[in-house]
Amino acid sequence: MKVSDFDYHLPEALIASTPLPERTASRLLVLDAANDQLRDAHFPAIQEYIQPGDLLVLNDTRVIPARLYGYKSSGGAVEILLERLTGGAEALAQIRSSKTPNAGARLTLEGGVEVEVLGREGAFFQLRFVSDTPLPQLLEQHGHMPLPPYIKRADTPADRERYQTVFAEKPGAVAAPTAGLHFDQPLLAKLTAAGVETATLTLHVGAGTFQPIRTERIEDHTMHSEWLSVPPSVSEAITRTRERGGRVFAVGTTVVRALESAAACGMPMQPYEGETDIFIAPGFQFQVIDGLITNFHLPGSTLVMLVSALAGREAILSAYAHAVAEQYRFFSYGDAMLIMAPRSEAS
């Protein structure tokens, strides 16, 4: 299939650049893929669809303040976007500057902290922060929240809270698992009180999630890699859910990628920790999920392909056209979809 098969027209005015005042105030477009039906609602309406005995799987990754500004020894400005922390004072990162820095170069950040360029690893630079202060603390002091490239504004203190889920615990992501941004603690408590089980896994979202596909055919695309951990509690919760006849709902495409990566190692699913470069596109056979809560994704992106694999390409493009016509808000700070997959799509 061609990448252009997953393109759609999006007016720039529909790209949300700020969050709504309340997390649960977002709109919700419900797509019942089995019956090809759409319903316009607001986010709390998920309580009508996620029933007692169902399982909601969350991603508890926490976004780090991964964007840093500074200058080279020549005085030229640099912008650093961390991709992942690799241990101690080291990290992999993208660097934007007028001239590519060489190994051994020293960069100075806002606040005077020095960073040494150790070398290259593929598309990323290997960096070492020269400081006695632990790297996570340095980032909290000098880093900026890594808002996506389509949000054309500087980050604000409010983004430290709102570009983060209320259940974020494990630092390491450089982009938010945005489907989770719509939940607040009262809504989660209502779901639990109604008999919905929750389980958490971790997938540290990388900046590669925003990278465009540069091939004409999707089969020629090389997917970026991300680190994940699916603990025993998740596989046990899925087993319990299946035994009682419940359904498994993923909160976000990151959860889909994590669960289906673990399932690819064999079913019943076992705990899994490591890297994944799974590419989910039409033709993929889902083994775990029955439904997905997700945001609206960029035209021609791997995430549009993922939701198309679950619900069908034509159904997704039709739903997106409806969302555009109804003035839904798109992307990270935008509105949400609930996709109910045909039961045959998941075991």
Describe the role of every protein-language-model region.
Residues 1-347:
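Surface-exposed, charge/polar-rich loops and edge strands
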